[in-house]
């Protein structure tokens, strides 16, 4: 007869996956509409969302690097990002960009000179995080600063990246097949990558059709494919970073998702690419928020 204290057998892998999926869906159902509302409202609501997101990402990044946020070397990262963000909000975008390498160097030097630093702490990665997170933060602010075109551009990028992520996850689960990069992320498949790319293009076309009746759909499809590819690359990059630090998630902040960094890795890569596209395309339409001509 089994003892009362005997442990229950572990849940089957499939049951665990469905529990995780329910958690992911619930978290997305709460956070997604809040993010979209802040994007739509713009102004202080949007700036507050970006500031809060950057602060959380800085905290997660410092912990990934094996440092404490409350000690000065770790505090240098959010301070550098805060200074760069203030410059971006004030439309001093060149200054905001210049503050990133300066902040990265300051964070790295501060960490290296700290006698209390843990032996395994990574000082170079600490500085790299300032640029990695800061570029996306500046991009979010710059791209949204043009009223209607900025709103459309941010919605386009966010929805395309979300579609890429969801499409890759669902198609990869249903179809499976050859692995995309088994040494970096064993669960990602080529079928998932292609499914994510197709979803990104379809959603991009839908957003463009809603926002601009004169949009050239071929151009929109190419831009959506580029952003979807950038998002997938950002996902792989974050997987490689977590593998380097031997962690599964950047934090446990979001149930079913891990940390904020785990959820916005695609956006961190796609936003700078979108800004580069907007710089080129916007010059043809007299505004920096346009992603297509």
Locations of regions flagged by a protein language model:
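Interfacial helix-loop-helix junctions of multi-pass membrane proteins
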Residues: 237-253
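Divalent-cation-assisted or electrostatically stabilized phosphate/pyrophosphate-binding catalytic cores
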Residues: 187-194, 252-267
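Final/C-terminal transmembrane alpha-helix of multipass membrane proteins
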Residues: 263-279
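Hydrophobic alpha-helical transmembrane segments of multi-pass membrane transport proteins
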Residues: 226-237
